[in-house]
């Protein structure tokens, strides 16, 4: 069994050997060189992700859009651990790349946007959206918003759009803090 090191996608060894050179993971978009050997298929889903999913769905059912007050705090906690540079979005992107959350994150400082590719949470986020849960738990979005708020003094509205094997996250100023 081969398993994608980014998103956990699994493919049997026999099928892997038949893949063409240009093949990319259907879930996160990395090349086949990012698939690793595994003695046996993963049994079930990662328990921590199941717990996180249950908390997210529960928050959404109870609070709806109000759950964003809780999930924004997640970004603030992560922002406390980021080395801030001249470019707050790049600082946040570098942190997530360094910790293996995504294969690449490009930043557009002028338009306050992140383009996250090969996200390790992509499949998780898509499953939440398919279940009707507005995704407010994105660590990239919440952390980048917290870093921007700290450096500019403004609050930001977050908008996420689907990109190629990830999301494009845009931030728009809404008010002074």
UniProtKB/Swiss-Prot annotation:
Its cofactor is Fe(3+). It comes from the Archaea. Binds 1 Fe(3+) ion per subunit. Residues 1-38 form the Rubredoxin-like domain. GO terms for molecular function: iron ion binding. SUPFAM superfamilies: Rubredoxin-like. Fe cation binds at residues 4, 7, 25, 28. Signal peptide: none annotated. Keywords: Electron transport, Iron, Metal-binding, Transport. InterPro entries: Rubredoxin-like_dom, Rubredoxin_Fe_BS. Belongs to the rubredoxin family. This is Putative rubredoxin. The gene is rdxA.
């Amino acid at each position: 069994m081969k398993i994608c090191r980014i998103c956990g996608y699994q493919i049997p060894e026999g099928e892997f050997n038949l893949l063409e050179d240009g093949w990319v993971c259907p879930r996160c978009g990395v090349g086949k060189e990012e698939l690793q050997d595994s003695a046996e298929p993963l049994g079930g889903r990662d328990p921590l992700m199941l717990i996180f999913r249950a908390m997210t769905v529960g928050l959404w059912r109870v609070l709806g859009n109000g759950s964003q007050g809780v999930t924004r705090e997640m970004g603030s906690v992560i922002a406390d651990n980021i080395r801030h540079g001249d470019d707050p979005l790049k600082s946040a992107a570098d942190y997530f790349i360094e910790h293996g959350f995504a294969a690449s994150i490009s930043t557009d400082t002028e338009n306050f946007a992140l383009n996250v590719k090969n996200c390790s949470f992509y499949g998780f986020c898509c499953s939440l959206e398919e279940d009707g849960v507005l995704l407010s738990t994105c660590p990239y979005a919440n952390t980048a918003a917290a870093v921007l708020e700290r450096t500019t003094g403004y609050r930001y509205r977050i908008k996420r759009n689907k990109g190629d094997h990830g999301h494009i996250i845009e931030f728009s100023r809404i008010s002074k803090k």
